Amino acid sequence: MGLHKLRLAAAVPVTFSSRLFLKPFTNTLTLGLFSRHLQPRNKPLLVRAFSASAAVQDIPATQTSDSSVAARPLWKAAIDFKWIRDNKEAVEINIRNRNSNANLEAVLQLYENMVNLQKEVERLREERNNVAKKMKGKLEPSERERLVEEGKNLKESLVTLEEDLVKLKDELQHVAQSIPNMTHPDVPVGGEDSSAIRQEVGSPREFSFPIKDHLQLGKDLDLIDFDSAAEVSGSKFFYLKNEAVLLEMALLNWTLSQVMKKGYTPLTTPEIVRSSIVEKCGFQPRGDNTQVYSIDGTDQCLIGTAEIPVGGIHMDSILLESALPLKYIAFSHCFRTEAGAAGAATKGLYRVHQFSKAEMFVICQPEDSESFHQELIQIEEDLFTSLGLHFKTLDMATADLGAPAYRKFDIEAWMPGLGRFGEITKVEDWESVTAHLNRLRRVLRKGKRIFQPLSLSTL
Amino acid sequence: MGLHKLRLAAAVPVTFSSRLFLKPFTNTLTLGLFSRHLQPRNKPLLVRAFSASAAVQDIPATQTSDSSVAARPLWKAAIDFKWIRDNKEAVEINIRNRNSNANLEAVLQLYENMVNLQKEVERLREERNNVAKKMKGKLEPSERERLVEEGKNLKESLVTLEEDLVKLKDELQHVAQSIPNMTHPDVPVGGEDSSAIRQEVGSPREFSFPIKDHLQLGKDLDLIDFDSAAEVSGSKFFYLKNEAVLLEMALLNWTLSQVMKKGYTPLTTPEIVRSSIVEKCGFQPRGDNTQVYSIDGTDQCLIGTAEIPVGGIHMDSILLESALPLKYIAFSHCFRTEAGAAGAATKGLYRVHQFSKAEMFVICQPEDSESFHQELIQIEEDLFTSLGLHFKTLDMATADLGAPAYRKFDIEAWMPGLGRFGEISSASNCTDYQSRRLGIRYRPSEPPQTGPKKGKANLPATKFVHTLNATACAVPRMMVCLLENYQQEDGSVVIPEPLRPFMGGIELIKPKHK
């Protein structure tokens, strides 16, 4: 029985959880538009970092919703263990700075064991091949018998070792997934309060009269209906009416046209996707407090962001260098359970189960990701400045980055009805992590394979 | 134990099934944009046609997915049994014309039984009240003992009869739901081929070059990606790219602005709703071959049309007459499993699991529904004429109406890439069929001259509203029409004039050089 060929896969074990309820209260309302945190996965995954073969098949889906160690994953992350081993001090410091609970020692140990076991397996295979070769020639019956016996023993040992190897690789992947992305050198080290202000635009408007919050305005101007939606659908759903409908369409139309001018390709996406895609993007559709709605009777889920179906377009692909960069502005409805989000930061339109969003997504060469990160944040700042908003752009500190982000800029706008700033967008540079997840590669002119980084921006 | 107060409810036992695979093949591709057909429900429902009280509570949700007769429904339709009984010949003819499998005899029989049982129950209650009254006075001990005994017996009989009554009402509702709406006298009787042409606009464009279908155009112009979507989501999903995104937004923007001019209120809606709302609108979320996606671990579903959440806005309400008519143009994404739809009519954008749609919905007084039906179809015809489409409006024959529709106009547009007409919109007058299930009523502003029974003291009795729905724009089907009809020999596609301002002035979708 040969080693199962498995699709390169991955799941950075992250969940959509609101940063809000994990952080101490400040004057800034962090809405956790799309935060990811690490959580050890209980499902073992197999890593295929050493196989040169690109063609793989899916492991039969035996994933169950309970965390059984025996459950085989559908796919694996192409994690660069050699690099981790060779840079272990930096990786350790990074893990600490990010408050991650990744266990680097365990990873390195398992990796060593795995490498050794792999060598042993290969050695046994070679011996068995030799035996098979010898048996092709003319032999004495006793010699033949001896070889048959030897072949059988080798085969039995191999089967055992190969099973062990599979388990070891699963375990290694399981532990290794917790390891967060490396961090940009300019990112401030520390918690939320250490985040640096990259820019502040405008100032809070001075009102000469008592002001209303958006809920009151929505009622008074007959723009938003939460009450009917609570009957029809449940809490955190709403209807938009009258000018609010036109406003939503205007926002999306205008945003699309502005961003298209910068060379982004407009896109609409499926809002139902296979759950494996959701996982590859780093979310746990079936975990407790999952943010993801699943469809009954299928392996499908609703997307929480267009990032998921857009990332999926190019999965398991090799792109030509000349095709890069790929720049998309993707529009979709987004669905989130908001499980676990409670308290004041759920009022009205702040936290809803369904909303429209335009998302920018960039696939580029590694050396370009930093400049695209700057391009994305610049586009956002320009958009919000044009709309006359008062906002600040934050360079998020290490403990506030999600696992995939190499660097993250959040924009928080002033919301007078609430008397605080609230997050309206973020821009993440995912560097190579998502590239691992979706197995994107770029073939350089020189023919060397390198993983591409991704830059993401939400609007 | 009193009669359980139950919420006005119902579920017409219908499913979203495509008319296509139920009808013989003709030169018209009936895409069954939104058809409903009858199917007996296995779950009994309780009817509340006789209770004057409007305030009710939900029956605890004990619905299970297997059809157990003991399962209590969450709500009931306010079906007018007296009217059915008094007009039974007309109802029977209607059932036959519509090829419905409703069993009128069974309904009438159950109704009789129910009425009689109800009388018996009321009689026993009155007796028990009398006994209780007598016991308030001064009595001989033996007399008191006798009355106590009598009271006990009456109570036991009542409990039994009341349980029977509940079961009977459930059974009655279960059978009665199959009964379709009555039919407009002008509707042709018969199958699909009997549908009458109300109007035909334009003529098929003559092409001087070999034409492509929308799939080919979508590939060549880099507008539609089905392949990636098949990997990411499955078949019948797609990405729109480049000008197609602008085209979708232009279609919706333009449609919205045109319809708003006619006094329709724009609306966006939740796309996740409780399954009971879906049922009240006449769909079976949990039947075999259901068109409805359900959400795991909840009682929620994805909507297949904005008609559902819009109908839900005013459910269990009494509107003022002065508030009517309510006219909405609602925009939403729609999700359909398309279970059971197979064959040639599933190609490309014809039949997809997710699409954008603008839907018109009207709530009005009964006497106005006919004129609103005309208004809706006129709006649709004007929209499609403005876009330069060649289409015909059909007055659908009786066998082709869904259960809720009193009358239905379908518009089928010429799709040259397929060489046939394909349904792009549908306008239905559902009269009071949905409102009896959703519980939408209105209170007339003045008492009528001849005195029918009054509701609350000095207030005129409430009546059920009429509801209508009509597709203003189903984006994928429109895209098929526009791409295929407006293609040029050089592979480009012309944008119809009304849409250009909504697309930043683009006049042409040109092939891109790679």
From Swiss-Prot, chain B:
The keyword Glycoprotein does not apply. One of its GO terms (cellular component) is mitochondrion. One of its GO terms (molecular function) is ATP binding. PROSITE patterns: AA_TRNA_LIGASE_II, UBIQUITIN_2. Its main location: plastid. Disruption phenotype: Lethal. In heterozygous plants, aborted ovules. It is found in: Plastid, Chloroplast; Mitochondrion. NCBIfam families: serS. Consists of two distinct domains, a catalytic core and a N-terminal extension that is involved in tRNA binding. Catalyzes the attachment of serine to tRNA(Ser). Is also able to aminoacylate tRNA(Sec) with serine, to form the misacylated tRNA L-seryl-tRNA(Sec), which will be further converted into selenocysteinyl-tRNA(Sec). This is Serine--tRNA ligase, chloroplastic/mitochondrial. It comes from Arabidopsis thaliana (Mouse-ear cress).
